[in-house]
Structures are given as structure tokens and as C-alpha cells.
């Protein structure tokens, strides 16, 4: 690992509400989140040195988007680093932002992401392009197929109960009813018994809900300039790791740290977590709130295991023992998770967790507020866990 010249701090952020108008272009979405984040941070646009921006390349018609993004945001001639790597790409964009600041080259960087619902091709037609196309397209596999196979193996290998999955979904929905930014905020609260049922309807309710088009932005600065903008800065660190793009290679891939695992574990997330914890200077015992990117309840429990909160196969024990609640040592998914906050792909899947932990540390979360929140961790993934990202925020005052 190279030399880090200074710490990186977060001083503001914003996300668009669910169900923004379908006639908004990606330019409108991106500008909305960008300017709201700058306003939240108290940063004039002239102070921004760089924007790192991720987008869903399958959902916009524009190629070479860097100068187009800079023009839409009103920052020309300042540079934009465009990133496209599926749902967790903002983790990479934030990694770019982090490095620009930690190296001393930039003082103020905005990490921005947006996702517009596919306007040109249906999800079913485009989804295989996010996988290993040479194999998966010919086999007809999509992310949804992968998720079903992964969940089935995880359930059988570790004897995971429907009760645990239903309980996961219940608490995600409980938090979402206390988060005005969540997709399910104003919807009726489901019953635990219904979520634990062995029915197709319950299975669907244990999976992510769609958020529609979404954009979000976060403002990062160097530790030495943070006090210029706020008296409550929050430390930010991030790491990511890759796994083979073809899911057939998820079984005992012959490299260190992966050969002992199969599709029922997340070794890429384990690697990203180790690096993120090291850079942030924390141990897993220091963490007191976690937000995970969960497209299914089972995947959420797998993420807890990969982060080291519990042993492999013991995620269900943590959930059933009340580990997700505000009374636990480390509450989980207080923003509502993918199941109830909503899946936002490149527009929010990484950012939503960072923003929630940031707002929790600032004490701005109302009924879902975690007591004495100091260290928050979040996860995100892309292309069926061939990319895994971990973010860490810590109280900095």
C-alpha cells in the first residue's frame, strides 16, 4: 500500500427522493443531487476541484460522458472522472475521490452517481450484459437467476430458515417507515408472519423493491481544510475488491482468499472489508452500525458474515437474536436496505449506505437514530458480486 498524505473527510451529501418524474433526463437528476449536496456542505461550486461520477452505461444513450457531465453540472473546465461498473460503481468513484484528496492533489471532490431507468431496452433484454456475456448471454442467465441460485445454495448449505429471511425483511421495512427518503416510506407495514411465509408472494417481499431513477452525491475534503466548512466533519474511507466475472468460477477459485469458498460466501467483500478497516484504523468490534446492499434477505445475511460481524452461516442467528434492532450492539440497515429503501443501482446502492451512516453520526435520523453512533460501515456490490465495496465513516469531532 502506498503512502497516504492526509485523511479524507465527508462534509455533506444529498439524494433524490423516490419516484422522480420519468421525464427528467440524467442531466437533471445529476445536477439536482450535485447542487443539493454542495448546499448541504456549504461549499461554493468554485471550490470543487474534481467530480468523480458513476453511471449505468446500459441506461443512457450518451457515450464519452465526461465533458457532458461537467457541462451539466456547471463546473467547466474542471475535470470529471466517469466510471461505469454496475450498481456499486459509486464505490469506485468514491475511491477515485478519496485518492485525489489523500494524495494532496485535490482539496474538494464530489462523488456523484446517477441511474436512469432503462428507456431503450427492457431489463430482461439488457441484464445479461452486466454478466460474463460470452457465457451468461448464451445460457440465458441474468442477475435475477444468479441471485436465486446463490440464495438456494446458501439456504441449503447453512440451513437458513424462512423465519430469518422474513425477520430481515421486517426490520428493513420497519426502518423504511421512519425514513422519508425510502421507497416504502408511505406504504402499509407488512406483518412478520406474512414475510416468513413459504409462498411466492412472501418470497417476492423478501427481495428488493425498485426505486426508479435516482441520483446522489457526497462531498469529500481533506482533513486540513474540513473546518473551513463545518465543525462536524466525518472521516471517510473506502476499499473495493474484484471476484471472477463468471459465476462458475465462484467455486474454489485458485487464488489466495478465494479457493476455500463457493457461491454461498462473499470472499470479495471479505477482502474489501479487511482493507477498509485497515485504512480506517478500526477493528470489527468498533463498528456500531452497518448498512448493506441487499437485493435479498439471504444476501444481506451473507454480507454480515463477510464483514466479520458473525461467523459464516451464523447471520441468521444474529438476525433472530434481535441484531438488526436499535437496541442491539450494531443495528443493521437503518436506512431500509434494498428491500424497503429501494434498489437504485448506480444512483444510490453505495451512496445510500454512506449517507445513512453519515446522518446517523450527525444525529439526524429521528425515530431510527442509533444511540451514540460513531463508526458506520456500508457495503455495495455490482455484477453479481464480482465487485464488492466497503465504506467506513467515523465521527471526526
Task: Please report, for each region that a protein language model flagged, where it lies by residue.
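Condensing-enzyme catalytic core mediating Claisen C-C bond formation in acyl metabolism
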Residues: 1-27, 132-133, 167, 198-267, ...
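Short glycine/threonine-rich loop-to-helix capping motif typified by GTGT followed
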Residues: 59-68, 246-252, 294-317, 345, ...
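C-terminal catalytic subdomain
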Residues: 257-318, 329-334, 351, 355, ...
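Conserved catalytic cysteine-centered active-site region
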Residues: 2-5, 55-146, 186-209, 242, ...
